[in-house]
Amino acid sequence: MRRAVLSLSVALMAAALLAVARLESQDATESKQTATGIVYHDANGNGKLDAGEKPLSGIRVSNGVEITKTDSDGRYQIGVTDDTIVFVVKPSGWRTPLDENNSPVFYYNHKPQGSPPLKYKGVAPTGELPKSIDFPLYPQDEPEQFKAILFGDPQPRDQKEVDYIAHDVIEELVGTDASFGVTLGDIVFDDLNMFEAQARSIALLGIPWYNVIGNHDINYDAANDRMSDETFERHFGPAYYSFDHGKVHFVVLDDIEWYIPDGSGKGRYRGGLGKEQIEFVKNDLALVPDEQLVVLMMHIPLVDVEDRQELYRVIEKRPLCISISGHTHHHEHRFITKADGWMGAEPHHHIINVTVSGSWWSGASDDRSIPHTMCADGTPNGYSIIRFDGSDYSLELKAAGRAADFQMNIHAPEVVSAADSSKTDVFVNVFNGSSRSKVEMRVNDGEWVPMTQTIQNDPAFELIVETEGKLTGKPWRDLPKPKASTHLWKLPLPSGLAAGSHLIDIRSTDMFGQKSSGRRIVRIVEGELSPKAD
């Protein structure tokens, strides 16, 4: 990571000051190094710049802070230190090379001495700065209409859970027409040796796959934040970067700050970006037209990032900007306003994406021996598909292993006393719903009636937790405690329902105009219910 965090006791302060002075002197020397190279059309696909291959002008290249453009000869120059990743900002209509796991290779990691000793292997020594760091690009068709797949927190602990992911989501996505995919952090669950197994599985989709760093993807034995992404860098390159696809500009952010509190000797993480990364975003967006949609992708939700106000100042004047995260293992559309310090003309749309792992692969197993792992807000585990059309976008939630039209869960008792029908609420969890959704209910062929949005625990999830909690000798991990859902609606049944079976219909229209529906049958009886009637 590009932020430096130094934690020392008072007794070591004098030594620290001397060390800092030496580091500053070293940085001053290192900053005089200049990387140079050519960005070119690799016509024969061999990954090498050959005679006659066309240099590409106007292509952006970055060192993680500064951004320069290639000249008419395709050449760039940019400053580097002994811990710099030089990378190309993929332009629209071009692709970068892909490795054997379909991970984009758009960078050169310059680390002459390699990573420090860590539990999980970092970057091997790269030696002296090459005379020319060249970046091959390949032309590809990128229409204004395209879609991408978003994975929140797959978070496998081991190979068994990598297999869960393979069977639960990868198999149904093979053959996708998505242009690329992104994992929004927590690629794995602390064991960084699982990066490779997870990447191999996702590679079967056959599309480029980008990665965001999460708090479970870092080196916990790192001495500071700057060294906490060494293993991530070895596998995936820079922890923050940007690229264009179609008419959209994507910015991947590293908002995991690793620090060691004074005197504690034990590291921890918090949401943070740091000055260098914010400077990169500022420099990056200065080269992006206002009419181009910008999509920020991160792990920790934006509202939980400590220096988010600095980022707000950079993006809030842009008319077209959204952000997407994971981390919290629920699904939510958040609209950031002045209540959180946002000063833009319109609220900022931030999506907290559903997680592939749901509730960390917990709960009873289904008929495939995969935990149902429902999120604590009642959202099924799964992923999102984000669609773009120029500067317009829409988001669809896809529940793992379910039909695409499974977009809601209706909770109502099996049986209700006729006398209590008007006092009995029907709840519907519209998984991708928000405060901008319209949700209505009717019973039988009655009138459609608007439902009321309510921020509370999903009673359906509460019932599952209660039911599974009573079991003994469970071979699975318990579900987490319920958390309030932001996409829950309720409405009481109408009065006067006759004894018999009645059909509840629900219809919903979300903020993107996407429609979904569901139904449930409830039985009405005369008289009092027995204690076990429902």
Question: What would you call each of these model-derived segments?
Answer:
Residues 207, 458-492:
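Aromatic sugar-binding surface patches on proteins
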Residues 43-53, 428:
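Acidic, glycine-anchored loop motifs typical of Ca2+
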Residues 30, 34, 116-196, 283, ...:
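N-terminal active-site segment of His-dependent metallophosphoesterases
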Residues 49, 55, 62-79:
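Short, acidic Ser/Thr/Gly-rich low-complexity loop/linker segments typical of extracellular
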Residues 37, 70-84, 135, 485-491:
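Glycine-centered loop-to-beta-strand initiation motif
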Residues 63, 85-121:
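A short, solvent-exposed loop/turn motif at the edges and junctions
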Residues 104-114, 119-125, 193-290, 307-324, ...:
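Extended active-site neighborhood of metal-dependent phosphoesterases/phosphodiesterases
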Residues 341-433, 437-440, 492-495, 503-518, ...:
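Binuclear metal-dependent phosphoesterase catalytic core
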